[in-house]
């Protein structure tokens, strides 16, 4: 991937959501109101505070994150659709069990 985010921006690959329930009922995309999930592919160096000190990001490459339906900007890189968003658009990091 030849995309390097700047400042507090994060590159996220959207993960497919479950479209079927455990009982086999198919859920249409319009009815699924869950936040989207994705994997962090790259992060910027962070943003600067008022004194110019760099504040590192809380997310790391490889983290699985939750974000809102309209978060970020979609870009196409090497035939793959990715999202570029600010770290503040990320709602949570999903911890593996």
From Swiss-Prot:
InterPro entries, per database record: Chaperonin_GroES (IPR020818), Chaperonin_GroES_sf (IPR037124), Chaprnonin_Cpn10_CS (IPR018369), GroES-like_sf (IPR011032)
GO aspect biological process, one term: chaperone cofactor-dependent protein refolding
Claim: Chaperone is one of the keywords in the record: yes
Entry GO CC: cytoplasm
Coiled-coil ranges from the UniProt annotation: none
Superkingdom as given in the UniProt entry: Bacteria
Places the protein is found: Cytoplasm
Subunit structure: Heptamer of 7 subunits arranged in a ring. Interacts with the chaperonin GroEL.
Protein name: Co-chaperonin GroES
The organism of origin for this protein: Burkholderia vietnamiensis
